[in-house]
Amino acid sequence: MTYLRSIGLSLLVWTGLFLLNGCAPQNEFAVEESEETVTITTENYQLQVEKGGFRYRFEGPEGDVIAPAHPESGLQMGPSSGSLAAVTSATLEERTDSAVVFAAQTDGGLEARVRVRPEPHAVQMAVRPKEDGQYDVVGRTGGLSPSYGLADHAAFGGGAWDEGVRPRPELTGFEMDPLRGYRMTSNFVVFPQQGFAEVNVEPGDKVVRLTETENLQGSRSVRSMPALYYFVGSPEQIYQAFLEVRNREGFSVMTPKYEWFGVGWEAFGALSWNTTQETVTENINQYLDFGFPLEWMVIGSGFWPSGEGEFDEHGTPYGADAQSRDADALLATTSFGMWDEQKYPDPEGMIDSFHEKGLKVTIGLRNGFIPGGPFTEEGIKNGYFMKGENGEAKLFEVGFPEPDVYLLDAENPEAVDWYMDFWQKWADYGIDGYKEDLFGYPDSLPDDFFDPVNEAMMKDSVYVMGRNNYLGSPVDIHRYNDFNYNQPQDRGPINGLAFAYSGFPNVYPDIVGGTGLATDRFGEAPESKLRTYLMRYAQYAALNPSMSFGYGPWNYGEEVVEVTREAARLHDRLQPYIYSNAMKATETGFPHPMTPLPLAYPNDPQVYGLADTTRRSYQWLIGKSLLATPLYGDDYARAESRDVYLPEGTWMEYDSGEVHEGPTTLEDYPLPVGKTPLFVGGSGIVVEEVEGELKGRLYPIADQAETLFYDRDGETQSTITVAGPDWEDPTVIDQSTGEEVPGTWRRHAYEFTLTPGHDYRVE
């Protein structure tokens, strides 16, 4: 199934090929044809196509092989009702200023045109069979490894989302046809060691095969495969080119908002279904009284009109029969401005009070409409819901709510506008944003079925926490699947790293403590284990781009409060630094807020075997200056140390200030509960917020360094340059005023007050 989004890519049909309508970067290239090959040469790579089998390989400027040709053929095609056949011959038909066009034919006589368009660090292949119809089309090279990406699929593989976990984010051996089944979907794959990557832009059925002998991506049941991209270059160059492709193809990467990168709170984790104005207010106040620096909150459960006592503390809504007609109609988050009046007697006053405390208030929201609901008939009448083969609005079984629902047709711009009008009912109460969390829907839906709604919300400055997504980033932060104590704990860091590899670095690792502690709905666990679980989870989450809390740590004693609060305060201090790196990711595509080490050090062989369920050295860079080394995984309750790998350079322990020279492995490095699992290195420049002031922190790591800092508005910039200072007595000059800025040594760094928009030089 292939269709055009209402936004983004505009396609024209010309000589039987899809052509991009503007926007594509131009690239100078030379074409050389021999009897057997066609060679396309650019400044950065060479693409050699063998006419027999359309076998293609990528080489570097010096002739080194980057990606080998497939041993049989580069393309396979066939009618969707049949089997794939290898392309056996290809001829050069045309060379234009922007592309090279081939005529290709399979051994069964199927003909197609193949348009190859070189870009500075990318190649687009568009394959269109000559005759109308529905086809399966794949492109393939020889095998490459190691490989990374695929978002949720890299964490779960083909396993159940709440039980399975792949042993590592590395993908060799992964095969799925079609690629489906999870909510956060990307078929972008990167090979850092080779300086290579690929993606077949297709929200419908996709094929991915990554074996020792074959690297394959393709589309099922399509008229054409117009956007198979290969990328060549350094990781930074690859992700910049991938960003341009995502935005150009209509899968936008949008500017995130600052507050989401602070510490949050979720009602479902804290209270399960027992949410009322009173319980929500009380729980938030408890966190604030204990000194937790909350900045955002989600009321995602139990706020809609319901029957008396329907969702009490130990109830479950998934199989519950509604006790009133209203509850039956509104057993979902699409109640749009309709609160349970007994549970939430003054929602506007409640929201105002949270705003006065400095919190952004968000609500749970999905796109499913229940038959008999107050807005459903209007949606059916106007054709705003997804339709079945008979052309009528279709009911879908989903994970929540219990009744089957109609799903918004987000490819219909009028339906999205209608939905946005309903959203305004929440905004009128002062709600700042929403948590998108539809699940359990048929995996036959296109992967981008929710993206246009999220994009419309973001354009309207709504705060959006996303879960369902394909390829782009039309949200502020990306949450991975519910992460509870009864599940494999290695899945969390593998999931987060896979998001980052896939170009989704604004990772939110779900609620510290998950969603089961308030009710024991996942079974009981020893309290001593749960105490350790909360502390380890908090320390792990604090080093992610966003974090939140649910069930109160005070329920498990003073030590748990102290450790989790310190983790929250660490994240709060680092929020400006994390957000600045999120802005860099938005501008460059490179996953700066959470950088897997193979992307930062692609030529270091030691970084490729760290993250797996045996070694559990789950490490990543936060920007250029911080190395996260959390102790997490299935052994969280018993482990006290990890083998920590420090890449090339000088690294300082965050707590003690002890210095190490890399590359080196700190074997059995002690990481007891409460120790900050963080090293400072790289540029040694970090910006923190302390008591409402921005502080530039200069660690004596590098004598020559520079960093660009984005303030909370995402636009105001400051450059900090370290230029051979005397670390015994450094001098900071505000280059915007020419004045010296006073500073002091604090926590192993020289610290000064930073004014947003001013540039600084350290001498």
Tell me what each language-model feature is.
Residues M1-L11:
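Bacterial N-terminal signal peptides that target proteins for export
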Residues N21-G22:
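C-terminal motif of bacterial Sec signal peptides marking the signal peptidase cleavage site
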Residues T37-Y258, F268-L271, Q277-E278, I284-D289, ...:
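Catalytic and substrate-binding clefts that recognize carbohydrates or anionic sugar/phosphate headgroups
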Residues N44, V127, Y287, F354, ...:
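Conserved, mostly hydrophobic/aromatic
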Residues P256-S444, P474:
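Aromatic-lined carbohydrate-binding/catalytic grooves of carbohydrate-active enzymes
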Residues A267-F268, V298-G300, L359-G372, Y434-S444, ...:
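Aromatic-lined carbohydrate-recognition surfaces of secreted/lumenal glycan-active proteins
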Residues G372-K381, P442-D451, R467-Y501, N506, ...:
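Substrate-binding cleft/loops of secretory-pathway carbohydrate-active enzymes
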Residues V475, Y501-P509, G516-T737, R746-A749, ...:
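Catalytic core of carbohydrate-active enzymes
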